[in-house]
Amino acid sequence: MSLTPPKSQYVIALDVGGTRIKAALIGSGGSGTELLYETRRATDREGGPDAVVEGILDVAGQLRTYGIEQYGTGPAAAGVAVPGILDEPTGTAVYAANLGWRDVPLRTLLTRRLGGLPVALGHDVRTGGLAEGRIGAGKGVDRFLFVALGTGIAGAIGIDGRLEPGAHGSAGELGHIVVRPGGPECGCGQRGCLEALASAGAVGRAWAAASGDVSAGAADAARAVESNDDRAIAIWRDAVDALAAGLVTALTLLDPRTVIIGGGLAEAGDILFVPLREAVRARVTFQQLPMIVPAALGDAAGCLGAGLLARDLLSAEVSSR
């Protein structure tokens, strides 16, 4: 936290997750992503979608008030990253299973709560990918693919400093590439999806079943691999093989120069990256092998990306005048 007044405009940044909201005030020092103040709060899913929305509006309002009190001027804009399906042109959060909402006019609600402030809305994984591409592991790379391995799996396609949302806002849903036809059932209704086999959630469930520890997760599986537990090694090898299959499909279609891997499973470090690089290399034929690197920004990527969205919005407004 810093109480130093920002050198110029600062923005509100929100990263809304299934369990918590990460929020920050971001100044324009250095790369334009100077963290001036950070806070976190529970998402309050138990209270239902209305409570989730009110929590977002409340923390945004608190950040605006804090900024005015500390710096003597209000924020210039706000950026918010949310999960699920978005209609970015209208600023509508169309659907998010983990938050329970449908067709929430989130940009309008935030603009109203923030006294008319311009608000940018973005998909959480694409927003994290934006930050990694501009100021993180993909900085200076013209074509990259950011893949988040968390409870699920999703990707973001980076092209010359911007993220490609697709025609309907669903580009990069790598988790629902079928890599094992007839495999485990996925939440989307298909079987054998990458997400059902290689996400941190899938690895954690497999290790919990194998170890008999119902509270075990992917991090426990990684530690067991380090300890040369044969059961964990088999589970890990299966997940890495599935992930390599999904990545080769993606690089065949997209031809990225760099693949950036983030999310909880990436925290395993070389336990993941060494066999994954080998598995991808073994599968490619005519494709150019990309660099496969860990994400650099950790769980700050979403907030930093939301700040970049807000700054892009300001830049667009200036250029349109």
What does each model-found stretch correspond to?
Residues M1-A77, D87-T90, T108-V119, A131-D142, ...:
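ATP-binding/phosphotransfer module of carbohydrate and carboxylate kinases, centering on a glycine-rich
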Residues S170-E173:
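Structural signature of FAD isoalloxazine-binding scaffolds in flavoprotein oxidoreductases
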